[in-house]
Amino acid sequence: MNIDKYSERVRGFLQSAQTFALAENHQQFSPEHVLKVLLDDEQGMAASLIERAGGDAKEARLANDAALAKLPKVSGGNGGLSLTAPLAKVFSTAEDLAKKAGDSFVTVERLLQALAIESSASTSASLKKAGATAQALNQVINDIRKGRTADSANAEQGFDALKKYARDLTEEAREGRLDPVIGRDDEIRRTIQVLSRRTKNNPVLIGEPGVGKTAIAEGLALRIVNGDVPESLKDKKLMALDMGALIAGAKYRGEFEERLKAVLNEVQAENGGIILFIDEMHTLVGAGKADGAMDASNLLKPALARGELHCVGATTLDEYRKHVEKDPALARRFQPVLVDEPNVEDTISILRGLKEKYEQHHKVRISDSALVAAATLSNRYITDRFLPDKAIDLMDEAASRLRMQVDSKPEELDELDRRIIQLKIEREALKQETDQSSVDRLRKLEDELADTEEKADALTARWQAEKQKLGHAADLKKRLDEARNELAIAQRNGQFQRAGELTYGIIPGLEKELAAAEARDSSGAGSMVQEVVTPDNIAHVVSRWTGIPVDKMLEGQREKLLRMEDELAKSVVGQGEAVQAVSKAVRRSRAGLQDPNRPIGSFIFLGPTGVGKTELTKSLARFLFDDETAMVRLDMSEYMEKHSVARLIGAPPGYVGYEEGGALTEAVRRRPYQVVLFDEIEKAHPDVFNVLLQVLDDGRLTDGQGRTVDFKNTIIIMTSNLGSEFMTQMGDNDDVDSVRELVMERVRSHFRPEFLNRIDDIILFHRLRRDEMGAIVEIQLKRLVSLLADRKITLELDEDARSWLANKGYDPAYGARPLKRVIQKSVQDRLAEMILGGEIPDGSRVKVTSGTDRLLFKVKPAKGEAETETADAA
């Protein structure tokens, strides 16, 4: 026996067999040990050969284990193994078989054949008992080999390569394991048309990710199984090549090429009977490429050109351009079939076709209105992905969320269970007490506990019953689906008696039972478990994904929106027109009446400094998101140079920072529903306005990497001081309309008409009047009071002190900012000195009154300390 004549896998098996024999304390190395390791192999080549030869691998394993149990064991020997005569004969027979077949190496299948042939070995009897004869094994080996010989030490990898490195889609379709393919008839017909050509009969499906390229290949497999294809494609097999399995574990140079050649040889040997489907086809280019080695695409080219290899590829537009088009010799061998994104109507049809599979998986029902909502909402709000993939994901996640709720304990029952635990803890504590009040309390508590437990038991029983009903309906759906699959198989195989039983007996019976179960469905009034996915569930998932509030508004939210002006006016004083315009835009959006192709609202706020332009934007962010920082704030003074426009949308290719994206586009892409503030817009370079044109008109902007960013759910606010000099010259009683034309003239001279024409509203903020300063004092003092609250210090200002601050801080040219400085200087600075000096301990009350030209501070400390009085410096 020359070990070099044996393949690497056989050598590995022989090594394992010897180790096993020593572990079992056997002194002799027998054929039974070899058969044992062959049958225990994870890849199961020997077991597969036995099954294909009409035998039972499990039976062979049991018979061989029985033979092994009879072998003598010797404990405490020298640890050596001697070769038995039957095993030596097996090796000799295997070498003879390999020589006759023209093989250079003895492979696993020849070793198994020798174990079946050699009558002196008990393995022959074990295999015969299992139903695998030497003749049957020989026939199976010849079928697998297809005339090929074992010329390398890794020859087994080349046999039955399609089974190892490809999935049979037609077999999966036959067994009903593929999802139904709805629509896409034109693309499938075009694919069949290309496949039916004489040469270059290789279509490549090109389309955006998620439009259904792989589904078209599965649709083709379903059509082949149903016989709904031209004569030239009937009874063909569609095999999906697994590039990962081909590359995985290929350690040595040439091993990958050997595997791929084995796949190609098997496909060619079928004489056009196999169509190869290569998903992510761009992975072929460069796959397996190493120093001097050929990549996969170069190995495929000759077979593709001669028409010996039928192939269907699938890849995205970008990957096709980047990888396949760079190799014209490969590209010309494929015929592109463009797969467009389906429209909303087609997507709804696709969802209706898939609905049953998802209902069966999640064990919930999906309403038709939920499917319509999934298609329409995903199309409108999830702009960076494609239909139907994003709509299917929405439906899937909404059903998954509902199933999770069904499996979780209902809130009502959860509260009762928590109450029971609380009462039990209290009961144990009261048992230790002996006084009368504790005894009375314990009696009451026992009654309450018994009552609560009774309620909880009743609710638990009801919840379990409702869950059981859902489970019953789900089981019926599963049985109905299995019956329909069986009917399709029976019709294909000509088993008309069974088909008749299914069509007129079993299926109608199951349908009737399911209809009755759904009629008693537990999602009626007063039900604890919701089992139907509704549009609200879909809308909730969209809101969680995007942050855009599209789910149904609660009553409180509606009221809040209707009194939005009052809420905003709490922090922005005297600018009723601006507050009203912004509120109306938000209400339009939440009511679903805004133009779906434009931002929610776009405004220019004009007015002198310090009148509340930026403050209104912050208040709006606080109102919508409960966080005034939830906005993109861009100070246009930073965008005064021409090149700074690139910072908004991202640097172009070839420039530093290309991968990082733009300040504006990235912020909106991450959070599509927010306020975008362009502060001091007049300071920006004119090119910035060119970028904003498409944002204001179409609600979209293309960033430096070519991605389209959706601005349809943003509120765009631009602030400017243009024309403010006219407004500061107004009298207290003058109307803002008197200077509107002068201000607009200045605005029109600075901004181009095409920019101004796209703005929803240009709002003038008038200068603050003296009588409005009191309200601003209130707002500023509230902020100061909230800062002092941490120290439990209470601040009170009487009317005179407030009036003193309002008068001292009034400056029509500078708005509310001088008032902020006066409060800082006259109140905050003095308080800071007194706190640090120990005059105001924590928990004190500070009363502020006004003197003739200063504020007086009266401190009432916590109990037990004397009052102090001090005055602010003039």
Swiss-Prot record:
Q: Where is this region: Repeat 1?
A: 6-71
- Please give the subunit comment from the record: Homohexamer. The oligomerization is ATP-dependent.
Q: Where is this region: NBD1?
A: 160-341
The UniProt record lists the Clp R domain at 3-147
Quote the SMART domains the UniProt record gives. Answer: AAA, ClpB_D2-small
Q: What is the lineage of its organism?
A: Bacteria, Pseudomonadati, Pseudomonadota, Alphaproteobacteria, Hyphomicrobiales
Localization recorded for this chain is:
Cytoplasm
| Annotated binding of ATP 1, by residue | G207, E208, P209, G210, V211, G212, K213, T214
Name the species this protein comes from: Agrobacterium fabrum (strain C58 / ATCC 33970)
Q: What is the official name of this protein in its record?
A: Chaperone protein ClpB
Q: What does this protein do?
A: Part of a stress-induced multi-chaperone system, it is involved in the recovery of the cell from heat-induced damage, in cooperation with DnaK, DnaJ and GrpE. Acts before DnaK, in the processing of protein aggregates. Protein binding stimulates the ATPase activity; ATP hydrolysis unfolds the denatured protein aggregates, which probably helps expose new hydrophobic binding sites on the surface of ClpB-bound aggregates, contributing to the solubilization and refolding of denatured protein aggregates by DnaK.
* Single GO BP term: cellular response to heat
Coiled coil located at which positions? 392-526
- Signal peptide boundaries: none
Give the gene symbol.
clpB
> Which residue ranges are recorded for the region named C-terminal?
768-874
**What Gene3D superfamilies does the annotation carry?**
1.10.8.60, Clp, N-terminal domain (1.10.1780.10), P-loop containing nucleotide triphosphate hydrolases (3.40.50.300)
Q: Where is this region: NBD2?
A: 557-767
- Region annotation Repeat 2: where it falls in the sequence: 83-147
**Entry-linked Pfam families:** AAA, AAA_2, AAA_lid_9, Clp_N, ClpB_D2-small
Chief subcellular location equals cytoplasm
